[in-house]
């Protein structure tokens, strides 16, 4: 782990989320794809110099509410499973995805937060 674990975790999560088949980014690209996962680091804590707990909000956009919830559920499952095999992320916890409409777009969004243990 380097001095800034948030910088390390985004590439690791992007790799873990590749099987979703949708773009994974920290920004919403222009033009916006029909389906998208955005990762937003939201902080965390560090118990020791070698251990950190990093929080990331995961937002999944899709054309329908059901598709957004399904994409978020898939992302959640991949993150929880990926923590078992990733070199950086050694444990993951995640809230359940919830629908969270995006009034600025015609897309539908579901979101959840994950806490990652990084050694």
Features from the language model and the residues they span:
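Short acidic low-complexity segments
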Residues: 24-31
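A short, hydrophobic beta-strand-centered structural micro-motif
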Residues: 32-41
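Charged, amphipathic alpha-helical segments and their flanking helix caps
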Residues: 1-22, 40-119
């Amino acid at each position: 782990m380097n001095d800034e674990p948030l910088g390390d975790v985004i590439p690791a999560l992007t790799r873990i989320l590749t099987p979703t088949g949708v773009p994974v980014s920290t920004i919403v690209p222009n033009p916006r794809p029909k389906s998208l996962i955005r990762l937003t680091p939201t902080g965390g804590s560090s118990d020791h110099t070698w251990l950190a707990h990093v929080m990331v909000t995961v937002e999944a956009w899709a054309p329908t509410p059901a598709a957004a919830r399904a994409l978020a559920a898939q992302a959640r499952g991949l993150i929880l499973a990926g923590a078992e095999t990733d070199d950086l992320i050694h444990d993951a916890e995640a809230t359940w995805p919830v629908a969270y409409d995006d009034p600025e777009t015609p897309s539908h969004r579901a979101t959840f937060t994950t806490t990652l243990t990084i050694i």
